[in-house]
Amino acid sequence: MSKRILVVENQPDSRQIIRDMLVPTDYEINEAENGEQALAAIAKQRPDLILMDIQLPIMDGYAATRRIKADPALRSIPIIAVSSYALNGEEEIARAAGCDDYVPKPFSPRQLLAKIRQYLS
C-alpha cells in the first residue's frame, strides 16, 4: 500500500514542482491550498506525511499545524514545513508550531525527497 502525502501549498507552480517530483515515486499525493482545506482533507483521508507551506490564505501553516498536533489522533503525522518566508528564526518558529522538519524554498528536490523518505521509511 502506498504512503499518502498531503501537499498544502497555495501557489499552483509550487504544487506542480512538488507533484512532478513525487509522481515517479509510489506515494499517493493529495493537495490543499490553505490550512482549512488541509484540515478537511485530513478528516477525509489521513495522510502519512504533510508538506506544509507557511504563508497560506485563510488559515496559515502555523495555525493548521497547531490544530493538527493538538489532536491526539493526528499528532503523530510528520509535518515538514516548506517555506520561502526567509526570516531569521523561521525554522525555530515552524518547529515551535509543531512542524517536525523544515525545508527552505527554493529547495533541492533531492533534499526534500530525502527528508520525505526519512519520515516515511
Regions found by a protein language model. Give the residues of each.
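Conserved acidic carboxylate
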Residues: 9
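Two-component/phosphorelay signaling modules centered on CheY-like receiver
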Residues: 12-30, 44, 119
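Hydrophobic residue at a beta-alpha junction
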Residues: 32-33, 56-59, 68, 89
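Active-site beta3 strand of CheY-like receiver
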Residues: 45-51, 56
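The feature encodes the CheY-like receiver
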Residues: 57, 75, 87, 105-106
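C-terminal output helix
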Residues: 107-116
